Amino acid sequence: MCIRDSGVAVGNPHCVLFTHEPPPAGAELAAWGRALGHHPAFPGGINVEFAQPISPTGLAVTVWERGSGATLACGTGACAVAAAAVLTGRCPRGAPILVQLPGGTLEVCVQRDDTVLLTGDAAATFSGTVLIQPCKAPRGVV
């Protein structure tokens, strides 16, 4: 895989890696994500996005979040990818950029004043039940 990286901070740190091949998924994403997300160059950890330009305003992206691993989508990650694409000349400033993630497509616009706008659907992807067992306080604790 041939990659070039860009560091971007959009409230949290992101390492955006551009590739000519489809972005990694599954075990390959996990291997790259763990290695880069916890690299000594990033002492607090970093979110990692792999992005393949698929059109002048389209990017296929997979995400490895530093706190949770592979995710279906990431709003700040989509913004970081679009910003990096604009800053490196891969996508035009001021135009809607479609960021295709495993969980759906988000539209990001990096405006001329560097404001970044994100538009996309919010959808429930999981549901479940959590059973919390009461615990006894240790002796001497009230």
Regions found by a protein language model. Give the residues of each.
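Active-site proximal loop and beta-alpha junction motif in alpha/beta enzyme cores
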Residues: R4-L72, A82-V142
